[in-house]
């Protein structure tokens, strides 16, 4: 029996003639979960089983590669080769399988009200924002998991992240970008990054936070300080005067460059204006790609497919029935954009998340909201797929218990499984589901896995 580092147990099948033991584990198993497995061997007829001369119960093993188990009895020894195989098919994953109804039951604190998830180097990383009303305390933490359900905190010397911070993998490093700390006093005693003049509120944040890691444990501060006087550096100027969209930025990679759509900014005492600007990393700052400006919309879905950037849906201005968009635009160089479809079978939608399979040739759309015939906001429970970003089809046979959310976090692992975390269950505002009041936000903590086909 093989027990993984997360406590899951699987029984191997012995082939006596070939002297092999094969243990098949679920498709959702990550290689990182197999790095420290324990073994239980039930031997017969006083047979002893060892590894390198030691009893197997005394060791843990990296079972990403086969190991040899010598079995000795009455002076004779047979060498059995144990191989762990990650299944490449699982029927219930095609329809979707709920991995967790609430990831806070597996190590994420109960006070978390916002989080985002990345998949990096075989592990999941969650960047959380928590708040305890009793003492007005805020907590910004990093957690890691090998299976998406059991989470362990990553201890960092500095506070990383903030409400609306978003991760991206670029150049073999994991980045977490943006976010604000405007609710409560953080764990280092820093006051909220918000000020009020009696009739309106504004951010005091003058830094675009960016942290990176190459190993998941050692983090480097790559934050960019704003400067409102730099008229020749628009990014630093916007950051410096507090008018940049820090909350819910959309980072992505294209043509070996790091891009980012701005998130929601603070204006007139509220968050608004999501996805209004497209930026590309340029040394120690970002440069705006103005060619995308007329195609961007609030909460549009931006993704890369077949070596192109696509922009789908979104809302013109506030989120309303007449403002939702249906068109699709794309770009082959990240500079010049064009409309390639006025509408799709997805229909008017905003807040959907689109990812591609690891081959980069098929896109999948999750979540988002639309308006029904009665004019009510409805979360999209369908999952769509497309090979060209224009023609979309509904994937049939999806688990009826799956419910879509607004702006879910979707990551694709090496097994071509899409892991869907969180998002917002409802959207009651006009511009963004984010608020300066925790009780006004309605996050989901469910996690699902879907095999991409």
What kind of feature is each model-predicted range?
Residues 1-113, 453:
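Beta-rich interaction/scaffold domains
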Residues 90-453:
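Kelch-like beta-propeller repeat domains
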